[in-house]
C-alpha cells in the first residue's frame, strides 16, 4: 500500500470520528456498503480485515478493508482473496494473522508469518547500556556515503541492498534484523534516507558494545512513517523535538497532507462513483480506439480502391484512344471487335469498383457517426 493510499484511508478513518482509535461496526460497515459490492463479498472483506475479531476496526484493519474493496472495484481481484495479502499486514498485526491462520488450519501461512524473537542478543552478557541516539556530523557524513552507494533511483534502500556493509560491523544477524525492524516499523521492503542513517547508527553503536534498545524515541519513530503522517489520533498536531538536537533534519516537510476526501459523506457519494466513472471511461476509450482502428482500415482500403479506379480509367482512356485511331485508320488496324470487347470488360471492372467504393464510403460514414456519438 503506497503512502498516498494510506493517507487517503487515514483521512476517511479520521473523518468518521473513531472512539479511542476504533471505528464501531456500524460506521465501518456503512462505508463498505456504499461501495455497492455484493453482501457476500463485503462479509468476506470484513472477516479478513477484522484481524482481532472484536467487531470493530482500528486504522490498520480499516486500511486493509478499504484497500481490498478498492482493488475489487478496480479489477485487481476478481474475488475476495482467501487471506489478507502479507504486504497489507502491519508488523504489530503479523502475530495475530499467524495465530488466526493457524486456528483455521493454514499452518503453512502461520509459519510464513512467524517472526523469530529478536530481543535476546547472543552476546548480551558482554554488552553495556548507554546507547546514544545522537549522530555526530562526521558519522552522518559516513552514513550518508554508504546510503548513496546503495540507494536506488527513488532514494530508497532495501535490506538485501545493504547486505554488503553488514560484515564489517560484526553484529549478529538477529540483531541486524532487530535494528531493521526498529527503523522500519511499517515493515516495508525499502526504507528512506533518514531511516537508513539511523539503521547504520544502531549497527555502529552495537559494534561498539552497546546493547540495542527495544524501541526508538517516539519523535524519531514518527518521522519513520513515510510522508511524515502521524497516525496517532491523540498527537496529530504534535511537534517533533528530536530534530532540534544536532542530529539531522527530516528529508521531507511535516505539513499535514491534504486529502481529496473532506468528510465521510464524500466517501459514500463521490469516491465510489469516481471509481465507477473511471472504469466506464476506460472502457469507452477502448471502444473508441477500436472504432478508430476500423475506420483507419476502411480508409486504407478506400484509398487503394481509388488508386485502382484511377489506373483502370487510364487504361480505358488508352483503349478509347486506340479505338478512335482504329476508326480513323480503317480496316488496316487491329480488330475492332477485340478492342470493343476490351473496352466492355474495362467498363464492367470500373462499375464493380465504383460500387465497391460507394460501399466503403457508406461504411466509413457509419463508423464516423458511431465515433461522434461516443465523443
Swiss-Prot record:
- GO molecular function terms attached to this record: actin binding; calcium ion binding
- The source's domain of life comes to Eukaryota
Q: Which residues form a coiled coil?
A: 272-375
What Gene Ontology cellular-component terms does the record carry? actin cortical patch; cytoplasm; endosome membrane; plasma membrane
What is the recorded membrane topology of this protein? Peripheral membrane protein
**Region described as Disordered:** 244-264
Q: Which UniProt keywords apply?
A: Actin-binding, Cell membrane, Coiled coil, Cytoplasm, Cytoskeleton, Endocytosis, Endosome, Membrane, Repeat
Please tell me where this protein is predominantly located: membrane
Localization in the cell:
Cell membrane; Endosome membrane; Cytoplasm, Cytoskeleton, Actin patch
Task: Reply yes or no: does the keyword Cytoplasm apply.
Answer: yes
Q: Which Gene3D superfamilies would you find in this protein's record?
A: EF-hand (1.10.238.10)
Domain EF-hand residue range list = 37-72, 171-206
User: For this chain's UniProt record, which GO biological process terms are given?
Assistant: actin cytoskeleton organization; actin filament organization; endocytosis; endosomal transport
> PROSITE patterns, from UniProt?
EF_HAND_2 (PS50222), EH (PS50031)
Q: Where does the signal sequence lie?
A: none
- Sequence ranges assigned to domain EH in this UniProt record: 5-95, 139-227
Q: Which InterPro entries match?
A: EF-hand-dom_pair, EF_hand_dom, EH_dom, End3
The protein's role, per its UniProt record: Component of the PAN1 actin cytoskeleton-regulatory complex required for the internalization of endosomes during actin-coupled endocytosis. The complex links the site of endocytosis to the cell membrane-associated actin cytoskeleton. Mediates uptake of external molecules and vacuolar degradation of plasma membrane proteins. Plays a role in the proper organization of the cell membrane-associated actin cytoskeleton and promotes its destabilization.
Give the family, as the similarity comment puts it.
Answer: Belongs to the END3 family.
Q: Report quaternary structure and partners.
A: Component of the PAN1 actin cytoskeleton-regulatory complex.
Q: What is this protein called?
A: Actin cytoskeleton-regulatory complex protein end3
Taxonomic lineage of this organism? Eukaryota, Fungi, Dikarya, Ascomycota, Taphrinomycotina
Which gene produces this protein?
A: end3
